[in-house]
Amino acid sequence: MKKQKGISYKTKGWMIVLLLPITITIYILAIIGWQQLVKIPVVQEWAEIINSSTAKLDVPTEYIELYKKAEDNYGVPWTLLAAHHRIETRFSTMDPLLSPAGAEGHLQFMPCTFVGWSHPSCGGLGKGDIPEKDKISPAIIEQYGGYGVDANNDGKADPYDLEDAIFSAANYLAASGAADGEIEKAVFNYNHSEKYVEDVLHFYHLYESQVKNLQAAAYSSQ
């Protein structure tokens, strides 16, 4: 009985060479087919539900209520406040909450922005030479037109108090146009850096998307 010969290595090599273009073509057609398929409304809903079921909001839950309270007061999207908080101090995990340039607190305010640029010591980058007691005085802040807010009514507007800092950021962003939908302009006004704007908007859009997906998942489960 003769022993059957297997396919030679040379033949296998030619088979791979011949099949490779076919495989690549099928792969490309599959991608194009999916791109066309996802344009169908029913398929879009199906894909969104799948994405929503695994959605997770990457914001510490203990801060969300404060963001939403500030949104109610100033009309600034709470997801934008969360994005600023993330970029400025990594949700207050930066230690200390003081930058080399002199920005202070949970949302990194320059003292002159917090207290007011009309303060006689203010100029340059805004570090100023403001007495510590005046930095947290609502009366002094009102006098010099600053953005610091006493959100918890304890008699102090303190950038190192989380609630005060979030409300102050919302106040500043609202005055810069965020409450009227001018998000990019407001973010740039907060920090005159294109990279900063890009980073904040990245997280803002991410959180907006995650919230939408979570809402869709909750709705689909009803």
PLM regions: where:
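Intrinsically disordered, low-complexity regions enriched in Ser/Pro/Gly/Gln/His and often acidic
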Residues: 5-7, 27, 107
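N-terminal Lys/Arg-rich, disordered targeting/topogenic segments
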Residues: 1-13
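Catalytic glycan-binding domains that act on GlcNAc-containing polysaccharides
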Residues: 38-222
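Hydrophobic membrane-insertion alpha-helices, especially the h-region
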Residues: 14-32
